[in-house]
């Protein structure tokens, strides 16, 4: 049909170009102040803190997923009438940032000690101002609706004050102490590391079994095995299981160390697995976490045999001064000379911790550090979830939460760095120490502790320090506790648990309780844990595999909306997400489909006006409006349960499969018949659909909705309320039957090789009995049929079973004579058959390959099987069609 120009359609570009449009739209949002939060507002508050990315970082796919979810939640709540604060900020990232600046200095042959601490820290601040925070621009590219006027940094003055305040309070409460305990030690960075900064990789090493005690089998001796034979220089004991009869007679005795004047005590400990190896383990308390615990239980000496550079020291042996790896070879050779080597396994694959930043092998090492005593804090964090003050989504993650907080070890909070929050402890000339709070002055002449705090310590204060704590502020009153924390399950312990511990520790403060006007608070009422992103085959992304996806590249190719929709559609609570380029391309195509549908509606005069009474509408109108209300309810339910995938699936299938593929086609027929109210239904459906899609696809929906409504912005539009229109079941059944009838006729046309758009004479019977009299026009139009003439001679017949119970039928007689070029159709089908048979052979060969089946991920095998099944079905279909081709 012909369409007349529409001024509303003229507001749209000819096609959707995200690269040209998205940044312009985002800047308009910023200029309009839509994302600014007002603590004085009378609206109910809703707040989310952005997990602060490292100031050194750039947007990775995990960020993109997390930010998409948070942006969707805050956009929806804003539309629902909440005063929304999405708090942005960055983490000072102690080790990462110091490493970046040190590498820059190294280019000019300099090290940080050439400048001294104060000048070096100034240089780090200079780097932060000039080069740090690139991720903020990338967040804008993604469409993050954060309140940029409140952007914070974990070393801001206000946040630094909060850090010193809570350190002082924890110290005064006896919850911070200094002790020599085992840590992850980086010999390159020369600092303790947190567990999350240690990456475990499989390496090929060696497993050396050697003998302590006599070389005579009839005399007391024990064989032990280790992958770090150099650590035997620090051995002070040998552990066996108390029930292991092989060694019971030796428990309590000693064996001499072969290189050092030291006796090794043989102890009975249930940690030992008697079935593993020889059932005996060497105990190096200062250089192995399990051995450290055994050493504590049995009061074993704990000599530290490596310095901060992992050089052997203080053993009084020839190995002193050797690097640990040099010593590994030398100790093994010395043991061999004495005849103590029992077995050498080489190569021996095993998992070894490496520094995430510097890449070297981590050395467990006894070190004097500052610690938080976590027992009472962890209990409070656990109780907050047990009591329902904080709810974890999905609930299946609760068990992991309790496993961590109920068995948490004390937290090492000191780092041997220059960049970070300096530990507020001062030492006097005679070894005295004092903790100095933010409003106190250290004694004159005393020296401050040189260490800085673990980055996770300051980020653990993030939910309340960014809102002004320890001061009583309007922001704390309005936006605390925060509404939800969105983060990955992989940092549930490292960040979430620590926020809960410190949040509950200050939860009863006047600043939090508003001077006692409300009870103690938790840092967030809900926690949503998302999974990890994997490649399209379900494999973990890694640089070594070459399968790391850059979200910025995908946004450049397909647009931010497409990336966001892909991530939201693929996510499930707590589940990992596998995506590939085909997924984001499909999302881009979905956006294009929406654009074209809206443009068509506007060109045909779609405008928001009051809808006629339902009785004045057609079956198609009542069906689409009823389905829209069902989808609205499902989307609301899904968002409320943080089921982003369910919301997106409902919207995708409604928009594409029902609205675009069917209702638009029916609307064309209705408009051709002069049913002018159709434009109102089109507009009403699009208005609701675009508002529902806006949280996930904000850019294209903004453009389309503004053209449709000519109103200011979807960002401040209202969220769709229940329409009161329930699905008309009679109308829905008629539409369903009509769709099936049209689909079957179209399938028949395709099988017959009819030319696209070629109309075919047909006669339909059983229409009245099937309650489809009102749908005949749609069937004729959509299936490209013409009325049967007086000399109609059907050459084909098909019967289509209809109705909810398949108890009704419409018989379609068609005259296809003269409509097919048989020779050309045969050539086309033979070409298609060859392609289908090639695919069938290829997939069959893969599935017959035992090596492939053993090594390929299950998801890949399933895909190959699906391809084989479809190729078989296509082959059979074409063969049958060729056989019947006359």
From Swiss-Prot:
EC numbers, comma separated: 6.1.1.9
Which Pfam family, any one, appears in the UniProt record? Answer: Val_tRNA-synt_C
Per its record, what are the GO molecular function terms?
aminoacyl-tRNA deacylase activity; ATP binding; valine-tRNA ligase activity
List each coiled-coil range.
820-851
The record's subcellular location field reads: Cytoplasm
For ATP, which residues are the binding ones? 543
A cellular component annotation (GO) from this entry = cytosol
Write down the chemical reaction(s) this protein catalyses: tRNA(Val) + L-valine + ATP = L-valyl-tRNA(Val) + AMP + diphosphate
UniProt key word RNA-binding: no
Mainly localized where? cytoplasm
- Which InterPro entries does the record associate with it? aa-tRNA-synth_I_CS (IPR001412), aa-tRNA-synth_Ia (IPR002300), Anticodon_Ia_Val (IPR033705), M/V/L/I-tRNA-synth_anticd-bd (IPR013155), Rossmann-like_a/b/a_fold (IPR014729), tRNA-bd_arm (IPR010978), tRNAsynth_Ia_anticodon-bd (IPR009080), Val-tRNA_synth_C_sf (IPR037118)
Top enzyme class, one word, equals ligase
User: Which biological processes are named by the entry's GO terms?
Assistant: valyl-tRNA aminoacylation
Q: Does the entry feature the keyword ATP-binding, yes or no?
A: yes
The sequence motif named 'KMSKS' region is recorded at 540-544
Q: Where is this motif: 'HIGH' region?
A: 53-63
For this UniProt record, give its keywords in alphabetical order, as a comma-separated list: Aminoacyl-tRNA synthetase, ATP-binding, Coiled coil, Cytoplasm, Ligase, Nucleotide-binding, Protein biosynthesis
Print the domain comment field.
ValRS has two distinct active sites: one for aminoacylation and one for editing. The misactivated threonine is translocated from the active site to the editing site. The C-terminal coiled-coil domain is crucial for aminoacylation activity.
**UniProt similarity note:** Belongs to the class-I aminoacyl-tRNA synthetase family. ValS type 1 subfamily.
How this chain assembles, per its entry, is: Monomer.
> What role does this protein play?
Catalyzes the attachment of valine to tRNA(Val). As ValRS can inadvertently accommodate and process structurally similar amino acids such as threonine, to avoid such errors, it has a 'posttransfer' editing activity that hydrolyzes mischarged Thr-tRNA(Val) in a tRNA-dependent manner.
What is the name of this protein? Valine--tRNA ligase
> From which source organism is this entry?
Mycobacterium leprae (strain TN)
Q: What is the lineage of its organism?
A: Bacteria, Bacillati, Actinomycetota, Actinomycetes, Mycobacteriales
């Amino acid at each position: 049909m012909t369409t007349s120009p529409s001024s509303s359609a003229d507001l749209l570009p000819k096609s959707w170009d995200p690269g040209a449009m998205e940044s312009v739209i985002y800047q308009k949002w910023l200029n309009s102040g839509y994302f600014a939060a007002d603590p004085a507002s009378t609206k109910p508050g809703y707040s989310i803190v952005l997990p602060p990315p490292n100031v050194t970082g750039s947007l990775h796919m995990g960020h993109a997923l997390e930010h998409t979810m948070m942006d969707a939640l805050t956009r929806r709540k804003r539309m629902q009438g909440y005063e929304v604060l999405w708090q942005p900020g960055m983490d000072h990232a102690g080790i990462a940032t110091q490493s970046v600046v040190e590498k820059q200095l190294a280019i000019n042959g300099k090290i940080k000690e050439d400048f001294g601490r104060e000048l070096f820290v100034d240089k780090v601040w200079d780097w932060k101002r000039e080069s740090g925070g690139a991720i903020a621009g990338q967040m804008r590219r993604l469409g993050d609706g954060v309140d940029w006027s409140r952007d914070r940094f974990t070393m801001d003055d206000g946040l630094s004050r909060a850090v010193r305040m809570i350190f002082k309070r924890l110290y005064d409460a006896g919850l911070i102490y200094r002790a020599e305990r085992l840590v992850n030690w980086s010999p390159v960075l020369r600092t303790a590391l947190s567990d999350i900064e240690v990456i475990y990789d499989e390496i090929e090493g060696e497993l050396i079994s050697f003998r302590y005690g006599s070389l005579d089998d009839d005399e007391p001796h024990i064989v032990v095995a280790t992958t770090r034979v150099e650590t035997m220089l620090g051995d002070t004991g040998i552990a066996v299981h108390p029930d292991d009869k092989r060694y019971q007679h030796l428990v309590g005795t000693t064996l001499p160390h072969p290189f050092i004047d030291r006796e090794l005590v043989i102890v009975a400990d249930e940690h030992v697995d008697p079935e593993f190896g020889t059932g005996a383990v060497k105990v190096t308390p200062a250089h192995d976490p399990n051995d450290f615990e055994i050493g504590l239980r049995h009061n074993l000496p704990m000599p530290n045999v490596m310095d901060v550079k992992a050089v052997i020291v203080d053993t009084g042996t020839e190995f002193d001064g050797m690097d640990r790896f040099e010593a590994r070879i030398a100790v093994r050779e010395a043991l061999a000379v004495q005849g103590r080597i029992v077995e050498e396994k080489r190569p021996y694959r095993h998992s070894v911790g490496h520094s995430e930043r510097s890449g070297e092998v981590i050395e467990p090492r006894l070190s004097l550090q500052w610690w938080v005593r976590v027992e009472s804090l962890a209990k409070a964090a656990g109780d907050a979830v047990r009591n329902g003050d904080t709810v974890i989504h999905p609930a299946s993650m609760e068990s992991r939460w309790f496993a961590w907080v109920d068995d948490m070890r004390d937290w090492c909070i000191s780092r041997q760095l220059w960049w970070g929050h300096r530990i507020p402890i001062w030492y006097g000339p005679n070894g005295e120490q004092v903790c100095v709070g933010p409003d106190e002055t250290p004694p004159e002449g005393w020296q401050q502790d040189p260490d800085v705090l673990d980055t996770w310590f300051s980020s653990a204060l993030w939910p309340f320090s960014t809102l002004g704590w320890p001061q009583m502020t309007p922001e704390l009153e309005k936006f605390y506790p925060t509404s939800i924390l969105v983060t990955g399950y992989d940092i549930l312990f490292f960040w979430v648990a620590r926020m809960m511990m410190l949040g509950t520790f200050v939860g009863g403060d006047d600043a939090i309780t508003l001077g006692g006007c409300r009870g103690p608070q938790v840092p967030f009422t809900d926690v949503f844990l998302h999974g990890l992103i994997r490649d399209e085959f379900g494999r973990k992304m890694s640089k070594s595999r070459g399968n790391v996806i850059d979200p910025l590249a995908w946004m450049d190719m397909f647009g931010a909306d497409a990336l966001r929709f892909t991530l939201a559609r693929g996510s499930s609570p707590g589940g990992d997400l596998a995506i590939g380029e085909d997924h984001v391309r499909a999302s881009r195509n979905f956006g294009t489909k929406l654009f074209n549908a809206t443009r068509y509606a506007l060109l045909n005069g779609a405008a928001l006006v009051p809808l006629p009474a339902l009785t004045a509408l057609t079956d198609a109108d009542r069906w689409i409006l009823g389905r829209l209300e069902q989808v609205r309810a499902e989307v609301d339910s899904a968002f409320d349960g943080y089921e982003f995938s369910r919301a997106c699936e409902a919207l995708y299938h409604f928009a594409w499969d029902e609205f675009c593929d069917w209702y638009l086609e029916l609307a064309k027929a209705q408009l051709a018949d002069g049913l002018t109210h159709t434009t109102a239904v089109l507009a009403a459906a699009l208005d609701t659909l675009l508002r529902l899609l806006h949280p996930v696809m904000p850019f294209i929906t903004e453009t389309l909705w503004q053209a449709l409504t000519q109103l200011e912005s979807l960002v401040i539009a209202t969220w769709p309320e229940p329409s009161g229109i329930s699905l008309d079941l009679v109308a829905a059944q008629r539409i369903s039957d009509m769709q099936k009838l049209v689909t079957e006729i179209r399938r028949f046309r395709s099988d017959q090789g009819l030319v696209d758009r070629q109309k075919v004479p047909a006669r339909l019977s059983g229409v009245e009995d099937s309650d489809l009299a009102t749908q005949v026009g749609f069937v004729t139009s959509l299936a490209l049929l013409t009325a049967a003439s007086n000399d109609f001679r059907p050459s084909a017949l098909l019967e289509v079973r209809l109705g909810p119970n398949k108890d009704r039928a419409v018989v379609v007689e068609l005259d296809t004579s003269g409509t097919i070029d048989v020779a050309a159709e045969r050539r086309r089908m033979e070409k298609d058959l060859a392609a289908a048979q090639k695919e069938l052979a290829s997939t069959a060969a893969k599935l017959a390959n035992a090596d492939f089946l053993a090594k390929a991920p299950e998801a890949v095998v399933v895909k190959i099987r699906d391809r084989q099944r479809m190729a078989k079905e296509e082959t059979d279909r074409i063969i049958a069609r060729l056989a019947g081709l006359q």
